[in-house]
Each structure stands twice: as structure tokens, then as C-alpha cells.
Amino acid sequence: MNPSTTQARVVVDELIRGGVRDVVLCPGSRNAPLAFALQDADRSGRIRLHVRIDERTAGFLAIGLAVGAGAPACVAMTSGTAVANLGPAVVETNYARVPLIVLSANRPYELLGTGANQTMEQLGYFGTQVRATISLGLAEDAHERLDSLNASWRSATCRMLAAAMGSRTANAGPVHFDIPLREPLVPDPDPHGAVTPPGRPEGRPWTYTPPVTFDQPLEIDLSADTVVIAGHGAGVHPNLVQLPTIAEPTAPAAPSGGNPLHPLALPLLRPRQVIMLGRPTLHRPVSALLADPEVPVFALTTGPRWPDVSGNSQATGTRAIVTGTPNPSWLDRCAQMNRHAVAAVREQLAAHPLTTGLHVAAAVAGALRPGDQLVLGASNPVRDAALVGLDTAGLRVRSNRGVAGIDGTVSTAIGAALGYERDHHGRTVALIGDLTFVHDSSGLLIGPTEPTPRQLTIVVSNDNGGGIFELLEQGDPRFSDVSSRIFGTPHDVDVGALCRAYHVENRQIEVDQLPAALDEPGSGLRVLEVKADRSSLRQLHAAIKAAL
């Protein structure tokens, strides 16, 4: 067995021992030893391999696999620009704390700076965006040192896994595992008895690192009028369930008996303190409250970092030790304002003459059932889901909130469905906008030999452009002569034709047909397109606020 083949097989074996169950592979020549090793592992049932031709979409597919299955995912590619195309996925997983292993092949280091083809300084390319960067030395044809090399390779692989999963830091994220490979890059005809150097007995990892316990209790007096803001990555806090809580869709669902608070109700109240869980990213009234120097903020997070955009947090921790008792009149008033806000949204949606993204979100939210997984686009869809009062009880809600880009969302949804279906029988529904869909339409390319989701429906709310800008300062009527082109970016793409090009089932329906369409029995991947209007979004949101 040649050295590159041996090294690749050892690394793949140790990744599997460390918990990797899904690997996305992008084709190339330099990463051939890894590709052969991964194919062998897939054929033997040790991993599930997903082959993709585009490294950018492959990275987001791996993100979806990781969050859907709750396990580290790996994406493997060749050298050069193939590595650079992982940049967006690496940045997203850094801030979203998703365990992603970028497994790149490299040229032998003596070729750097020589003008050799497809060669660049890729070690360290991701800089501070990764938790760790490790390069294995070139595999040597030294049988007498094989035991030592085996130990070194397996130890390095375990170090990568520990960094990716945050086993010693409580801060999961991406890592870059770079492996220079020398020719021959394809397996030799194995001599009789040639075997991969073994790992630990009984399939154990070479170096086991138990997950760190990160616990910082923080005492908080609840006698002041308190609201809870639960953002992305919020933990579960049963002792705060009675407090009025603005929960973003990706926050854990509140237990029964919770006290939900609609985000539009917040300006109608005067909280005296805030408990912030995770990282809020969606609502301007929330940002304004967190920036109010007169309102103390207590930040509870599940890792070592905490958000504090305005510098207003007074204390941080991981869980609350509560004292004092909430004022019943405060709880009652919050519940009343929540009902008022929910009713205002519902009434204005019913009165509005045109279909908007909010109407599509409301239809999707009403059609979901316990056990479903929901993937939301990072622009208007995740905000619309919050505004229409999505009930997340019994659901798993995903959205790329790390840096909240629209890129890679189709691939993330496909990966999330594939990952979720490993251990769950529920379906996956994705709600995304048309720009998000078009931006990552190449994610629809799933080869005929590749795993396909059992039940994934992508709902495209198509208002022919960037509807979110209608609601921002750029959408002010005084910019109407230019904003549609430079912010709205209409594209006139035929979504159905695009789906047909990738052999994906699709149809265009009206918003009132959406619940029935989502309930239809079926399998595989399909796209439901709902035409929506964005020109009246500003008017609709103004009407909702006026009704409050």
C-alpha cells in the first residue's frame, strides 16, 4: 500500500471513530487518496458519502448535515481554489458554532512558490475563522516507522475533532485539516495481507476527549419587570419559563406553560431588566431595548462568547439562579400585549388585498406538525415566521444565523433534511425567498448515485427580488427611482424551468393552496413556488404597527 493511500485510510478511519457520519466529497486529482478511502468507507456502511461538484455548495450541505444530525460533518476537496470556495461556509460555522471539518488535499510543500499547477499557500488560508489548523506531514514510505506514523496521524485527527466539537472549549466550530499528498495518488494493487494500520480496539478513538462542562451560574432577581430575549443558540432554562419571552424561531421551544411575547409588543411595554439568551439577531425593537443604558441586561450563553453590541450587559453566565418573584400584574400585562400584537398581525394580513411573504410564512406556519423540521431563509422568511407567531413546539427550526447570509440556503436545507432523517421520521419544510433560491440554485444538483432527502419541500416565496429592502431605509419612497434596481434586484427567473433543469419536481400554487399541498403524501425533493408582492410590504407593516 503506497504512503498516501495508507495515510488517507488512517485519517478517514479515525474521523469515523470520532463521530463523523456524513462526508461531502468534491472531486479532484490531488485528493484522490481521500476519495478512495471515503468511497471504501461508504461502501462498507461506515459513513454516508455525498459527492458534489461545487465546493461552495458542498460546504453548506455539510452545515445542514451537521445541524440536522447533531454531529460533526466533514467536507473534502482538492487543492487550490477548491479550498477557497469553502470560505463562506467556514465563516458561517465559526459564528454559528457548527462543527465542520474542512479536509483539504495539498501539494507537497516543496512545490509552493515554484509555479506548480493548482498550488497555493492554503495552509492558514482561513485565518482566525477556524478553531484550529493542522497539516499532516507528507506520508513516508518507511515501513519500519509505520506504527509511529499511524499514532501521529490518528492523534492529529483526534485533535481536529476535539477542536471542531469544542470538547475542551465548549465552543464548536470549523477546523482546517490540510494533508499534503505525494504521488502515487491512486491505490496500488494491494500485496497479499496489506492492511490499514489499526486504531484502538473496539472502534474507540485514538485519543478520547470528553466534552467539557461549562457552567457559570449567575444570580438574577426576578422581582423587577423582566423580559427574556431568546436568540439563536439559546439554551434551555426551565426556571425562566414563566417570564414573558420573545423567542426567535431558532431558539428552543418553550415548555408548556410558557409566556410568549410577540416582538411587536415590546415597544408597548417598559421592562426594567432583560435576560438575554443566546444571540438575538432579528428584531429592531429588541436591539433598541438591549441598547437602553437604563435597562440592565444579563447575558446567558452556552459557550465562552456572549453578544453585547451596545456594551450594555451587566453580567454574564450560562444559567440563572433566580431570586425574587415576578410581579403578577407585569406578567398579565405582557400576556395581554402579546394577544393584542398577535391579533393585529392576523387582522392586517386578512385585510391586505395582496399576497406577501408574510402571508406565505403564515400559511407554512399553520401547516406544520410536531416532528417536522423547518429551515428558514436568513432574510425575510425567518423574520416573517417570527412576526406571524410561529409555534415552534414539537418542531426543529434551523436557519443560518451565524453571519446571516442568504448564500447556501438550498444546500443547507438539503443537508438538514438528510441529517434529520437519520434518526427522525418527520418531514423537512424549507421557506426561502426567490433571491435566496436563485443564489444557491446549483445546490439542487444531486447526482443520480447520491443520497436524496426522503421528504423535503422547499417553499419559494417569489416576489421577484429582495423584499427585505422594502422595509429598510433603502426602501424609503424618496429612493423609489433607483432602489428597485440596486437593492430590489429583480431577476425574472423562471423558477419552474430552473427546477426542471435539475430534474426537481415543482409547481406554482396560490398561498391558500399551500397548506393542502404541504399535506400531500409524497417522497423526495420538491419545490412549491408561491408568487408574492413586495411593493406593498412597507404599507402592510405600517398598517400592523398602526393597529398596535
Swiss-Prot record:
Cofactor note: Binds 1 thiamine pyrophosphate per subunit.
EC number: 2.2.1.9
Protein name, entry field: 2-succinyl-5-enolpyruvyl-6-hydroxy-3-cyclohexene-1-carboxylate synthase
UniProt entry tagged with the keyword Transferase: yes
CDD domains assigned to the protein according to its UniProt record, in alphabetical order: TPP_PYR_MenD, TPP_SHCHC_synthase
HAMAP family reported for this sequence: MenD
Uppermost EC category: transferase
